[in-house]
Amino acid sequence: MAFYSEDDKSEDYLFKIVLIGDSAVGKSNLLARFARDEFYPNSKSTIGVEFQTQKMDINGKEIKAQIWDTAGQERFRAVTSAYYRGAVGALLVYDISRRQTFHSIGRWLNELHTHSDMNVVTILVGNKSDLKDLREVSTAEGKALAEAQGLFFMETSALDSSNVAAAFETVVKEIYNILSRKVMSSQELNKQDPASLSNGKKVVIPSDGQGEFKKGGCCSS
């Protein structure tokens, strides 16, 4: 998968992806590591709306991932429906060293389904895998929850960058694959180049066939 800078040619697709999960699980550092290869060990909770973009190439098509951070709103249980609007992918993040953040996953998943399409491609992310001596949630527990909910799964470390790019790429690739299958199966569009559908506009995938995004898949750290 190739990456591009913001100055390169306009993208074929724009996918909105949201980061959700309890405060201080490392969402902002995951985004910083993926988008800018940076890490802030003493970072405070995000304040204000923030999103970053990253371009990548999949099968010769240029994809721009527009990745949104909750901007600290989760501390006040005030993540709004506008945050989720138009999202086609999500990273649902917990901290492997804080079991309570794992227990909150069900609430975040319900909120995601309430405010967005049920078919949003979602990966469950156990962050801070570098904190091995402080681990409170086992890899097996994370995998089991992901399998039960039909989610992808991966453990990451924003500190040492383990699996960070892979987690985002998993979501983007699955969104693209699903969109490509929909284009190929459409009688009206089967002779067109899939890139002609979006050409730089946000992609919102129709919600027919609710199980289509639920391609349970697991990757451990």
Curated annotation (Swiss-Prot):
Motif Effector region: where in chain: 43-51
InterPro entries for the chain: P-loop_NTPase, Rab_GTPases_membrane_traffic, Small_GTP-bd, Small_GTPase
GO biological process: one example: protein transport
A molecular function (GO) term: GTP binding
Record flagged with keyword tRNA-binding: no
Matches recorded under Gene3D superfamilies: P-loop containing nucleotide triphosphate hydrolases
Keywords of the record: Cell membrane, GTP-binding, Lipoprotein, Membrane, Nucleotide-binding, Prenylation, Protein transport, Transport
Domain of life where this protein originates: Eukaryota
A GO cellular component entry from the record: plastid
Binding positions for GTP per the UniProt entry: 21-28, 69-73, 127-130, 157-158
Membrane topology: Lipid-anchor
Lipid moiety-binding region (S-geranylgeranyl cysteine): 218-219
Location of the protein in the cell: Cell membrane
Protein family according to the UniProt entry: Belongs to the small GTPase superfamily. Rab family.
Role noted for this protein: Intracellular vesicle trafficking and protein transport.
Name of the protein in its database record: Ras-related protein RABA5a
Species in which this protein is naturally found: Arabidopsis thaliana (Mouse-ear cress)
